[in-house]
Every structure is written in structure tokens, then in C-alpha cells.
Curated annotation (Swiss-Prot):
Keywords from the named record: Amidation, Neuropeptide, Secreted
Modified residues (Glycine amide): G8
Name of the protein in its database record: Kinin-3
Keyword Secreted: yes
GO biological process, one term: neuropeptide signaling pathway
One Pfam family, short name: Kinin
Similarity section: Belongs to the kinin family.
Record GO cellular component, one term: extracellular region
UniProt subcellular location: Secreted
Organism from which the protein derives: Periplaneta americana
Function: Mediates visceral muscle contractile activity (myotropic activity).
């Protein structure tokens, strides 16, 4: 989830 993290 890009809104929460950069990898997923």
C-alpha cells in the first residue's frame, strides 16, 4: 500500500 509504505 503505497499510501502507508513504499514497498507494498
Amino acid at each position: 500500500d503505497p499510501s502507508f509504505n513504499s514497498w507494498g
